[in-house]
Swiss-Prot record:
Fourteen ClpP subunits assemble into 2 heptameric rings which stack back to back to give a disk-like structure with a central cavity, resembling the structure of eukaryotic proteasomes. The gene is clpP3. PANTHER family: ATP-DEPENDENT CLP PROTEASE PROTEOLYTIC SUBUNIT, ATP-DEPENDENT CLP PROTEASE PROTEOLYTIC SUBUNIT-RELATED PROTEIN 2, CHLOROPLASTIC. This is Probable ATP-dependent Clp protease proteolytic subunit 3. GO terms for cellular component: cytoplasm; endopeptidase Clp complex. It is an enzyme of class 3 (hydrolase). Signal peptide: none annotated. One of its GO terms (molecular function) is ATP-dependent peptidase activity.
Length: 197
């Protein structure tokens, strides 16, 4: 039986009364965003909107993006990535559990020096996948686009990890799993959190 979204008490600054709000709304007020599902257009739009709002409120203050995601749509993930690069606020990324596929891409996209994972987290990189049906020309167009996106993602991973592009291409050819420590050595994150930040 699902428990739904938990509610927590919150009193607005200067307010007289306490309201019950969703735990995610409460976390947003502390500049914490939680990505705990597949990356799709809906969650991407929500994350982008919150990032833009928080950045406009206080552009010098860090935004925390906690990630426990198996990945998802490349275009949705790239929209979040572009927003992270666009805003003035540093984005601290923290893997809690799993950051796979587009989840690991966003983890590595955090501000350098502020990319972290909990000790028992798993991180996985791989090439993008896609599927299409139809006429041969449609399949050819889709294949060219997937190859273009794969090259783009490989280039960004190489920039964010300081790994040679050839190594990234080889490692991403199939699912490549890493522990938090291995991800740090690889350059996807900057540190493993052993104690509370």
């Amino acid at each position: 039986m699902p428990i739904g979204v938990p509610k927590v008490p919150y009193r607005m600054p200067g307010g007289q009364f306490t309201d019950w709000i969703s735990i995610y709304d409460r976390l947003y007020r502390e500049r914490i965003i939680f990505l705990g599902r597949d990356v799709d257009d809906e969650i991407a739009n929500q994350i982008i909107a919150v990032m833009l709002y928080l950045d406009s409120e206080d552009p010098g203050k860090d935004i925390y993006l906690y990630i426990n995601s198996p990945g998802g749509m490349v275009t949705s993930g790239l929209a979040i990535y572009d927003t992270m690069q666009h805003i003035k606020s540093d984005v601290v990324t923290i893997c809690v559990g799993l950051a796979a596929s587009m989840g690991s891409f966003l983890l590595a996209a955090g501000t350098k020096g502020k990319r972290m994972a909990l000790p028992h987290s798993r991180i996985m990189i791989h090439q993008p996948s896609g599927g299409t049906r139809g006429q041969a020309t449609d399949i050819e167009i889709e294949a060219r686009e997937i190859l273009r996106i794969r090259h783009q993602l490989n280039q960004i991973y190489a920039n964010n990890t300081s790994q040679p592009l050839a190594k990234i291409e080889k490692d991403m050819d199939r699912d490549f799993f890493m522990s938090a420590q291995e991800a740090m050595e690889y350059g996807l994150i900057d540190r493993v959190i052993e104690e509370r930040v």
